[in-house]
């Protein structure tokens, strides 16, 4: 049985022969050496384009001891908030002379860990973890190998940096707002095991207690997804004591909750007030008009 093979990839030797120069000169050009005359550089680059030659990124990283690539793990590609942050990461990386290589964790700690290992095998120069489902102790092991920044985790670790807002305070502000509107029966759709979701749940409970509403605390299991928000809202609507307001752990889940309310014929905010979190672009649409914590 014969097996078909793709066309042979051009090598640095092929480029040297096409340009009529030495292999070492081609190597200097590919490593952006300032010791190459402009005419020779142009000839090498032209030959490389004609042949479709691309330098081996792994080999270059071994020589330079850096890849020029930052690995970025997003826990959920479907979350617009994460997409907005990833866009900013890509722009900042580009300005710093780096490329960002994105990978997804799919809200699954095991898959997220596997994605990190793959990025480490690709010799990325640093790792940015957005909305990680992993505990900080696990992340700290990788931080001992390369620089790591976690977004959404508050870390006091000496081996990694963290970027986060005060999720607990934001959730407290959301409940304070609803109480100021006159609501007393305020439920919460929480976001599951994500670190930020746990902090937002604490903020909800703290604010309810501060307003003397601890007996009214009602936290319904959900997730940082539209399906998670919709299913949790359906659970709420099936009860006999329906709250007058619901604080949802993030905007994506709040959109799902809005959809469930719409299907049930419940008008927002006339019959039930809803507050989300993250201030994603969709929440700003006039057709949605979702109150959210920025």
Task: State the predicted function of each range.
Residues 1-6, 50, 91-96, 144-150, ...:
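Bacterial carbohydrate/catabolite-sensing allosteric modules
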Residues 1-10, 65-176, 180, 238:
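Alpha-helical recognition/docking segments in bacterial nutrient-uptake
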Residues 1-66:
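N-terminal helix-turn-helix DNA-binding module of bacterial transcription factors
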Residues 50-56, 109-110, 129-132, 258:
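Short gly/ser/thr-rich secondary-structure transition/capping motifs
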């Amino acid at each position: 049985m014969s097996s078909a093979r793709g066309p042979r990839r051009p090598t640095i030797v092929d480029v040297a022969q096409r340009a009529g120069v030495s292999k070492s000169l081609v190597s200097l050009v590919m490593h952006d050496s300032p010791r190459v005359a402009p005419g020779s550089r142009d000839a090498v680059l032209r030959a490389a384009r004609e042949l479709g030659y691309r330098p081996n990124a792994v080999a270059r990283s071994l020589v330079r001891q850096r890849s020029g690539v930052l690995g970025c793990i997003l826990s959920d590609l479907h979350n617009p908030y994460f997409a907005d942050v990833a866009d900013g990461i890509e722009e900042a990386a580009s300005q710093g002379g780096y490329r960002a290589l994105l990978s997804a964790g799919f809200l699954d700690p095991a898959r997220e860990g596997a994605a990190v290992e793959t990025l480490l095998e690709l010799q990325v120069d640093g790792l940015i973890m957005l909305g990680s489902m992993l505990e900080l102790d696990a992340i700290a092991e990788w931080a001992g190998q390369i620089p790591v920044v976690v977004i959404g985790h508050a870390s006091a670790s000496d081996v990694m940096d963290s970027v986060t807002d005060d999720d607990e305070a934001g959730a407290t502000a959301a409940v304070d707002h609803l109480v100021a509107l006159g609501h007393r029966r305020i439920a919460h759709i929480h976001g599951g095991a994500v670190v930020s979701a746990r902090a937002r749940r604490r903020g909800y409970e703290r604010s309810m207690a501060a307003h003397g509403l601890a007996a009214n605390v009602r936290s319904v299991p959900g997730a940082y997804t539209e399906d998670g928000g919709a299913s949790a809202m359906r659970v709420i609507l099936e009860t006999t004591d329906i709250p007058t307001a619901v604080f949802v752990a993030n905007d994506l889940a709040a959109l799902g909750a809005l959809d469930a309310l719409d299907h049930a014929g419940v008008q927002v905010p006339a019959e039930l007030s809803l507050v989300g979190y993250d201030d994603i672009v969709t929440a700003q649409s006039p057709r949605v008009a979702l109150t959210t914590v920025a």
